[in-house]
Amino acid sequence: MRPADTWKDYELLDATEGNRLERWGETILIRPDPQVVWKTPKQSPLWAKADAVYHRSNQGGGEWEYRRRLPEKWKISCGEGEEKLTLIVSPTGFKHTGVFPEQAVNWAWYQQKIRAAGRPVKVLNLFGYTGGATLACAAAGATVCHVDASKGIVAWGKDNAVASGLADRPIRWLVDDCAKFVAREKRRGNTYDGIIMDPPSYGRGPGGEIWKLEDCIYDLVTQCEEVLSDKPLFFAVNSYTTGLSPAVMEYMLKTTLVPRFGGKTSCDEIGLPVSATGGVVPCGATAIWEE
């Protein structure tokens, strides 16, 4: 398990009975988490002082119960110095806030690889969401192409770039279907030194294209192999679904990339440390190929 344990503006205070108690800056939120199957006693007094609670609906989705008036959005920071990112938090109707804090452990890893390369690095970030990984790579000096199917989410990413003081960095922000974009990049002869992929379990492209993780992931990985440069640095695949284990993702990268590029693969869960107990809540997994 690789814990994201360097946050100051985010904290997983406690977790029990299917819920997380979280601090986002000065705001306390309670959100459901299907991984939290244990029913241990609540350790934090802040359970009773949460500013907002997300309630799931039996029909799917859910809604927020606000116990005090909150701003529509606010900012939190991650990292320090040149690698500091400032990200906009806003509770959405799908329980998310615009930031997956567990990914900070990956952001730091990407930055280390880019800085150590000692050469210009081009990164492709697919299913890039609100741009945490994109901005981490850009802050480390990379040229980045960010692709997501949601126009609103890409706009959020651009706002994060402004908040982080990175709006002038070489970032292309694209609203597109990831598989179609990669196919076009192959035809154009464009290549990348690093690829990051953060695919959802299920989704739709801007043209109504259907994405189902288990059915589509291998084809996309093999397509991406063809847009890697001659001397790539890394290829990272993140997964949030329990149906795709870290070992399965690593196997795909090992059999697809190692025969051509050499290098090595690894995989592990990523998670968030719980302040009240010292345990770590698993939040997904990452498989990595690196030179």
Regions found by a protein language model. Give the residues of each.
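Non-catalytic substrate-recognition/targeting regions of SAM-dependent transferases
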Residues: 8-22, 29-101, 108
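Conserved alpha-helix/loop element of class I SAM-dependent methyltransferases that forms part
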Residues: 101-118
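Short beta->alpha hinge that forms the Motif I/post-I loop of the SAM-binding pocket
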Residues: 128, 148-152, 216
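C-terminal catalytic and target-recognition region of SAM-dependent MTase-like enzymes
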Residues: 232-291
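Conserved SAM-binding loop of SAM-dependent methyltransferases across substrates and taxa
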Residues: 130-144
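Conserved class I S-adenosyl-L-methionine
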Residues: 118-129
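S-adenosylmethionine
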Residues: 178-258
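S-adenosyl-L-methionine
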Residues: 150-196
